[in-house]
């Protein structure tokens, strides 16, 4: 979907439908720009008040656009960002299968919401039909956004397009089943990205023998139960090599049975989404390549499959990590931190400015924050504040949680340096504290996206979060650093 901005209705374009957003407190003034036949009698007859998400068809009443509708904002001054998605869904649901080109008058929408509204339209327009014999009949390609004043300059529109591309790509990867999307497949996707953007990307793939040579036995403890070998993949986005890089590390457990600590069968199909952290890293790298932001970024993917077998790790096994620390694996279903800890050690070779890991790490984070906010853990107040700001700007929000020494003793083991679980309480925090032990040589933040990376129920599927947040964070760094 492509966007173009106009200050007035573009009568010479090929748009087939017009939506006009209207403020319930300024209904008449919002419509003064348009010559609408019988407006007063229509409003009286329909009792249209422009309440939130209330629609009013005006078919044949505008000479400039026969197919037009009003869409209420309620009181625009009281509109909240959380409601933008609903407005976008209303428009997309109505237009997506009918029109290639539509126009939306957003003059009544507060200017500070223009970027988020455009982004919401792209998110609402996503559909996944890769494995369906009957494909979605989506035809919408172009949206004209009309407002005499807008925050959507050329840079903002470029960011919308880039985020749309990266987020949709991440959603596609997340939605693919485990028999298609396995560790080697993620490595192939990274190589395909590099082939698409050869001037921007350098990809390195580590196989299991190379990991063993580096001493990555925590990672290998996860992948050893599977017939599918694990991979660590790095993608270096080389637009500004003289800078120390931002490193993004994604958990890529392509299917998580729990291993010997087997998960319950109900809902296990959703464990294909346990690689959504890695998908978000790949999506962010794609978005960076589309936007060509002048910044140095490294994406790292820890890709493994966690399966039970005669070769699988047993509860109580002890392994040595790449850092030299030993780990007692009390629960093989706490595997994400094991693939991440070795990857977080490996990426030190890039001399990072900051490191952000993204992982569907704990059910405890879902209990704490639900499906609305991602968990943010960082001992670095400045980095945490930057991520919180980016989350608000992109409406891909986070909530900061503690990662403090008081919790570290819960990870003590009588047999090894550290246990891979910390008991029944504060599971999201102790998981972050585990990772913190491997990140003390650089600035670091951890995003637990177990609650936000996918949805269940009727809207089941990957969300592509936190690609919008990560791209906003990187764009902000470009702006700050000039």
UniProtKB/Swiss-Prot annotation:
InterPro entries xref list: Leucine_aapep/pepB (IPR011356), Macro_dom-like (IPR043472), Peptidase_M17_C (IPR000819), Peptidase_M17_leu_NH2_pept (IPR023042), Peptidase_M17_N (IPR008283)
Cofactor details (free text): Binds 2 manganese ions per subunit.
Keyword Manganese applies: yes
First-level EC class: hydrolase
Binding site for Mn(2+) 1: 256, 333, 335
Keyword Hydrolase found: yes
PROSITE patterns: CYTOSOL_AP (PS00631)
Compartmental location: Cytoplasm
GO molecular function annotations of the record: manganese ion binding; metalloaminopeptidase activity
Required co-factors: Mn(2+)
Any one annotated GO CC term: cytoplasm
EC number, UniProt record: 3.4.11.1, 3.4.11.10
Organism superkingdom: Bacteria
Keywords assigned: Aminopeptidase, Cytoplasm, Hydrolase, Manganese, Metal-binding, Protease
Catalyses which reaction(s): Release of an N-terminal amino acid, Xaa-|-Yaa-, in which Xaa is preferably Leu, but may be other amino acids including Pro although not Arg or Lys, and Yaa may be Pro. Amino acid amides and methyl esters are also readily hydrolyzed, but rates on arylamides are exceedingly low; Release of an N-terminal amino acid, preferentially leucine, but not glutamic or aspartic acids
HAMAP family noted in UniProt: Cytosol_peptidase_M17
Record function comment: Presumably involved in the processing and regular turnover of intracellular proteins. Catalyzes the removal of unsubstituted N-terminal amino acids from various peptides.
Sequence similarity: Belongs to the peptidase M17 family.
Name of the protein this chain belongs to: Probable cytosol aminopeptidase
Native species: Acinetobacter baumannii (strain ATCC 17978 / DSM 105126 / CIP 53.77 / LMG 1025 / NCDC KC755 / 5377)
Lineage, opening ranks: Bacteria, Pseudomonadati, Pseudomonadota, Gammaproteobacteria, Moraxellales
Gene that this sequence comes from: pepA
């Amino acid at each position: 979907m492509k966007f173009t901005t106009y200050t007035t209705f573009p009568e010479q374009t090929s748009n087939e439908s017009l939506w006009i957003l209207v403020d319930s407190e300024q209904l008449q003034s919002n419509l003064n720009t348009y010559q609408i036949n019988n407006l007063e009698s229509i409003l009286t007859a329909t009792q249209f008040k422009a309440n939130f998400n209330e629609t009013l068809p005006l078919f044949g009443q505008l000479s400039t656009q026969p197919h037009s509708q009003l869409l209420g904002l309620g009181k625009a001054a009281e509109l909240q960002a959380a409601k933008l998605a609903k407005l976008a869904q209303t428009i997309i649901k109505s237009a997506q299968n009918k029109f290639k080109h539509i126009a939306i008058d957003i003059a009544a929408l507060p200017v500070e919401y223009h970027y988020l509204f455009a982004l919401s339209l792209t998110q609402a327009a996503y559909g996944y039909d890769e494995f369906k014999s009957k494909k979605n009949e989506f035809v919408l390609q172009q949206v004209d956004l009309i407002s005499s004043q807008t925050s959507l300059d050329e840079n903002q529109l470029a960011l919308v397009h880039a985020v749309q591309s990266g987020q949709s790509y991440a959603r596609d990867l997340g939605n693919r089943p485990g028999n298609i999307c396995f560790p080697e497949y993620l490595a192939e996707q990274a190589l395909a990205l590099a082939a698409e953007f050869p001037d921007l990307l350098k990809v390195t793939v580590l196989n299991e023998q190379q990991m063993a040579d580096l001493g990555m036995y925590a990672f290998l403890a996860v992948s050893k139960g599977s017939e599918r070998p694990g991979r660590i993949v790095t993608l270096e986005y080389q637009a500004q090599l003289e800078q120390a890089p931002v490193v993004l590390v994604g958990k890529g457990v392509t299917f998580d049975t729990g291993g010997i600590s087997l998960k319950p069968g109900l809902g296990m199909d959703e464990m294909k989404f346990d690689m959504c952290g890695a998908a978000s890293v790949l999506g962010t790298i794609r978005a960076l390549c589309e936007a060509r932001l002048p910044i140095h970024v490294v994406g790292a993917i820890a890709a493994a499959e966690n399966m039970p077998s005669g070769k699988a790790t047993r509860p109580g096994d002890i392994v040595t990590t790449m850092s030299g620390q030993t780990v007692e694996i009390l629960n093989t279903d706490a595997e994400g931190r094991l693939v991440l800890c070795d990857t977080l050690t490996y990426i030190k070779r890039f001399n990072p400015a900051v490191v952000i890991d993204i992982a569907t790490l704990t059910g405890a984070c879902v209990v704490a924050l639900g499906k609305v906010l991602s968990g943010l853990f960082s001992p670095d107040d400045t980095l945490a504040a930057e991520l919180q700001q980016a989350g608000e700007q992109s409406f891909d929000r986070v909530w900061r949680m503690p990662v403090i020494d008081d919790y570290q003793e819960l990870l003590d083991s009588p047999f090894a340096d550290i246990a891979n679980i910390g008991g029944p309480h504060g599971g999201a925090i102790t998981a972050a504290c585990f990772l913190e032990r491997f990140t003390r040589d650089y600035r670091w933040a951890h995003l637990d996206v177990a609650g936000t990376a996918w949805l269940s129920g009727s809207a089941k599927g990957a969300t592509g979060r936190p690609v919008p947040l990560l791209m906003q964070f990187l764009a902000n760094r470009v702006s700050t650093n000039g």
